[in-house]
A protein has these predicted regions:
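Carbohydrate-interacting regions of secretory-pathway proteins
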Residues: 19-227
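Positively charged n-region of N-terminal signal peptides that target proteins for export
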Residues: 1-5
C-alpha cells in the first residue's frame, strides 16, 4: 500500500511539473510568421532568426500569424552594439491606426549604456511604461555580445519580464488583452550600423494553465505605477 501511495505521489508531482511548451519557431523556416511595416531582412542562420538592419526603412517587425492573450514566453536573444530592438507582445497592426503601424507592448532590447533591456515600452502608443529607472538593479542583467535568456509572463492585466533569471519589469495594464508577438528590427540613422544584426532562437510559448506556472510575486520586479 505504501508503495502505491508513493507511486501516486510521484506521478502527481511529475504531472504538476509537466509544463506544455509550444515552439514558435521551428529553426528551419519562417512558417507562422509574417513581415510588417519596414523592409529589413529576416533570415535563418544556424537555427536562429536573424534580423538585419537597413538604412532608409522604418521599424520592421516579424509577427506571428496567430494572436495570444495569456501566455509565458521564453527565448534567447543576441544583438550587435549600436542597435536597438525589442519583442512585441499583445500587439496589433490596423489599417485605421497610423496606416497599419505595429503598436503595443514591447520587451525592450537595449545594448546601449542606458541599459534598459527588459523594460516595457508601448510601441507607437504611450512610450515608456516601465523604464529601468524603476528597477536599477536589473540594468546589469543583460550581457552585451552574448546570448541572453528572456522570460515574459502576460497573465490577465499583469505583464512581467526577466533576463537571465533577473526580474526586470512588472506592470498592470488593461489596454490590450490579446495580440500578436513580433520581433523588431529598429530603424537606423547611421550608415555604419547597416548590416548589423539582432538574433533570436529557442522561442517557445506556454498558453495552458499559465497561472499555475507563474513565477511567485516575491521573485518578480517591483511593480511600476502607471498613474
Amino acid at each position: 500500500m505504501k508503495n502505491i501511495v508513493l507511486t501516486l505521489l510521484l506521478f502527481c508531482a511529475a504531472s504538476l511539473g509537466a509544463q506544455n511548451w509550444e515552439p514558435l519557431f521551428n529553426g528551419k523556416n519562417l512558417k507562422g510568421w509574417k513581415k510588417l511595416n519596414g523592409k529589413a531582412e529576416y533570415k535563418i542562420v544556424d537555427g536562429a532568426i536573424v534580423g538585419v538592419s537597413k538604412m532608409g526603412t522604418p521599424n520592421t517587425f516579424l509577427a506571428t500569424t496567430k494572436n495570444y492573450g495569456d501566455f509565458i514566453l521564453e527565448f534567447d536573444f543576441k544583438i550587435d552594439d549600436g542597435l536597438n530592438s525589442g519583442v512585441q507582445l499583445r500587439s496589433e497592426s490596423k489599417k485605421d491606426y497610423k496606416k497599419g503601424r505595429v503598436h503595443g507592448y514591447q520587451f525592450e532590447i537595449d545594448p546601449s549604456k542606458r541599459a534598459w533591456s527588459g523594460g516595457i515600452y508601448d510601441e507607437a502608443r504611450r512610450n515608456w511604461l516601465y523604464p529601468l529607472t524603476l528597477n536599477p538593479s536589473a540594468k546589469t542583467a543583460f550581457k552585451n555580445n552574448a546570448w541572453n535568456k528572456a522570460r515574459i509572463e502576460a497573465v490577465g492585466n499583469s505583464i512581467r519580464t526577466w533576463i537571465n533569471g533577473v526580474p526586470c519589469a512588472n506592470i498592470w495594464d488593461d489596454m490590450t488583452p490579446v495580440g500578436f508577438i513580433a520581433l523588431q528590427v529598429h530603424a537606423i540613422g547611421n550608415a555604419a550600423d547597416e548590416g548589423k544584426t539582432v538574433r533570436w532562437k529557442d522561442i517557445r510559448i506556454c498558453t495552458t494553465d499559465v497561472e499555475r506556472y507563474q513565477t511567485p510575486e516575491a521573485q518578480a520586479a517591483p511593480e511600476g505605477d502607471l498613474c
